[in-house]
Amino acid sequence: MLFLAVFCGFIAENIREHNVEQHRAKEFSKSLVQDFQNDTTAINIQKKSAGIFIAITDSLLHLSQTTLEDRHAAEFSFYTRFMYWTVPLSWNRSTFEQIKNSGSLRYFKNFQLLEKLMKYEALVNEIEGEFGNHQTRGNMLLKLINEIIDPTLHYNLSKHQLLSLDTMSRETKEDFFTAKTSSLENKRTAIRELLNMTVVQQRNLRYNDGRLQRAKILANELINDLKKEYHLK
């Protein structure tokens, strides 16, 4: 009887531990789902901003083939201002970091789910590493931007962000494009350096878009997997 009592107590303790672990895994999963949802929103914004950067790089290259005076100088100055775009993607990593640092990965018994979580973290690290390089090149571009555009124009344009170009009215753009602007022909050396650097930025943003898309797909898969595994709404 004593053996049976001890055995039953052991079973009860195992069940209790299992229930506690399941509860903790479920609570962590709720936070992870929210983090991944926030990440997908941030990824969409980043992809849109990168798309605008890529497009205006093409505009600058096209304008550079013209005589950079009057309207062409104004347009070139306008787009040049937005070449300094170094806003990072704010990943939501606190929950997963807490899970790792507290040894709570053991609560997640689904190996495929764990594998996806680790794959997502590796992909985020890869994206962040490249964006660190993007920021370094962006800071190098700032010196060239300052050499090329007029400080007053720079000040007026600083009220607008890269993403706002997508919704900026034609009237507002036309005001900038028709603003009195000095010839940029005497700044061709700085312009050449700027264009070469922006082409590098453009190329890497195009390449990084693939990583962002993979991260978005994986985040959505994890949201669905976590909801299914832990019966979340």
Q: Where are each of the predicted segments found?
A:
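Membrane-embedded hydrophobic alpha-helical segments
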Residues: 1-19
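Long, hydrophobic alpha-helical segments that serve as membrane-spanning/inserting helices
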Residues: 14-233
